């Protein structure tokens, strides 16, 4: 791999992100080598199913695997008159073995508590409890900060970001 690396993808959905990802794990490491990417993060939606397979296959091609997950998060408490929690995705990336352990705990929390629609989610207390050694990417209009801004809740967005 040359030293002219241009890009490291930090939000890639694989075939394990049902109805969202099309990237086949078998072809990902070769594509990274071909595109001169020294590392890539697989951040499937609400699961870590590919973590081991991805780590082994990427490492075997000299590509640094970055393990992460896009987790649906309940980003605000229910207000009077609301019946469903507001949910938005956050991308969490493990910085270390401890971060990976926390990512697995959060992934388990997803399926221990569902909203009334039966959708998996974590709340802010769980996210705060297991946040050590995790990098959080909240960008995009569909994320919690973008959603709060779109709803005109600027102070809440600033509070959430901090």
Task: Give the residues covered by each predicted segment.
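Phosphodiester-processing cores and adjacent nucleic acid-binding clamps
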Residues: 1-162
């Amino acid at each position: 791999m040359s030293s002219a690396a241009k890009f490291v993808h930090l939000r890639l959905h694989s075939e394990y992100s049902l109805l969202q990802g099309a990237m086949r794990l078998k072809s990902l490491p070769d594509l990274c080598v071909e595109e001169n990417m020294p590392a890539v993060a697989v951040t499937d939606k609400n699961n870590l199913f590919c973590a081991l397979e991805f780590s082994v296959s990427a490492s075997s091609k000299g590509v640094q695997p970055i393990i992460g997950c896009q987790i649906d998060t309940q980003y605000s408490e229910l207000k009077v008159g609301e019946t469903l929690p507001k949910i938005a995705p956050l991308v969490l990336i493990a910085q270390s073995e401890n971060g990976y352990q926390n990512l697995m705990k959060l992934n388990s929390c997803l399926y221990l508590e569902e909203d009334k629609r039966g959708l998996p989610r974590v709340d802010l207390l769980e996210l705060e409890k297991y946040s050590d050694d995790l990098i959080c990417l909240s960008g995009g209009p569909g994320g919690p900060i973008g959603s709060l801004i779109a709803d005109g809740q600027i102070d809440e967005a600033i509070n959430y970001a901090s």
